[in-house]
Amino acid sequence: MHPKRLTQQYHRLYQHFSGQEVDTQLQQLADIACCTRRHMRNVLNGMQQLGWLKWQAQAGRGGRSRLRFCCKPESLRRDSAASLLGQGKVEQALEVLDHDKQALATILLQQLGQHWRNNRQVLSIPYYRALPSLYPGTDLRRSERHLVRQIHSGLTVMNEEKGEVEADVAHHWHQHSSLEWHFHLRPCVRWHDGRLLSVDDVKDSLLRLRQLPLFSHIRTVQALTPRCISIVLNEEDARLPTLLADSAALLLPSNHAQNPEFASHPIGCGPYKVMANDDLHLSLQAFDDYFGYRALLDEIDIWILPELGVEQSSEQQSTKGLEVQVSPVASAEQAYAIEAEQGCYFVLFDSRSAPLRSQVLRQQLSHLLSPLLLIQHIPLDVRQYWTVASSLLPQWFHLRQQHEVVGVPAHGTLSLNLAFPEDQPDYPAIAQAIQDCLAAAQIEVSCHSISFTDWQQGLGGFDMYLGSVNFTSDIDYAIPAWLLGTPLVRNAAFDAHNHQATDLHSEWRRGVLDAGNLTAYVLSQHTLLPLFHNRLRLQVSDGMQDLKLNALGWFDFKSAWHR
């Protein structure tokens, strides 16, 4: 019998007899359960085998038998749901709990962390929001940028520890001429659906990138042989192998656009394949036919538990965005890996906005929103891991090198609109602090929570944008790629009429402009104001091995394992 149906029958019997031990007859129980005597006998045997009740049957049709209940229905439902979750049967567990997600979250708390399931190593991780899009080349947040690298592969890959580009699907490459590169492909690379990766898959994946600013200089992509791709550029780019290690350049099947569910259930050729992805959990399974070293962890379950944030303290809520918990239940065997993030919170003054076209006003606003002043308006439990920023990176000090004399905005009515991405716990507190600081200068700020896609694209006609960014280990690539490749930053920070972004992009590709100089220039225009640096935190238990915190606040799934 279906677990939910069996628990319903038990609940019906328990309610009828108020949980009391009774002498009864099989026919009476069959009438209560609305079934035949034969079926009722099977139901009682099943419940007794599970330890739910004791049934001492008496011989003869008229004999009275003794029924004793061994557990309460609420406890039974929890145990049944826990058993189903242990088997990976999420929907059935939710049905048993009458779709009570809070009850599901309570049970999951006891099952998070490392465990075994059917002789397979499983790691269950809590997360505070759903992950509906794992589509490379689209607008991806920090965690999604990490996850797509676990699911997909590219021609090249960045070794985060060394800060060097390494081979991935392409085992070798070379620069054939100043504008042409050749990449040699591994044989027998398979997609998660079992199909072999073809040279056409690679070609189509690269051609679709040309719509993005970072890849707009790709002129043609041709297959020289079934295992060799030629990429011809419009302008020189010595960083092309690094560019192709970007999460946007991960390879996709040629027919992926025909799958309406590809964003949530993508087909890749990376170490893990997506087994389930909904508002309850993301389930990843190690891909046995992966062309590299097979992942050590067999399954990764990421449970979407926004309910946990409600129950935890405000300190824990405010830092959830930069903390990955392998197990949220405290124990003496757990430890934290903590590192300063290579990135920051920032506010962007959109130079396309009518009032903010004035560099003088942007400069005055930057002065009013000095990180040292702003942080005093943010509750201590929110900012306990923060330090004030002097540039995009904690080791840079561009703002301290600026010594301009600034005034204050002219008296009068000035109203500005501030937008920030939804579903991020820290932003409302920072937005409130910005409101407070500017209100002291008689500037009214209206705050708006918008979708990440709208924020990333700079949609909505807002004057200011609050956000955060984390950079990978190759800073000379990552920072210019973000400044010049993110639609919001590119359009808001640079003068479109003078093709400023295009010119700076060309200088960077040629190696004339580096990350430090480009950052110094952007900050000198007062369109971008770094605010605070946070700390990336990874809570781990003693049984987990080789969990190394990366620049995105996560860890490489395929290298981790547990004893």
Please give the residue ranges for each predicted region.
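A bilobed periplasmic-binding-protein/Venus flytrap-type ligand-binding module shared by bacterial periplasmic
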Residues: 285-288, 339-364, 368, 377, ...
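Ligand/substrate-recognition segments at binding pockets and active sites
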Residues: 19-28, 33-39, 51-57, 407-469
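N-terminal lobe/hinge region of extracytoplasmic solute-binding protein
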Residues: 125-176
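A structural "hinge/loop" feature
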Residues: 130-144, 240-246, 539-558
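Surface-exposed binding/hinge segments that line
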Residues: 214-260, 267-281
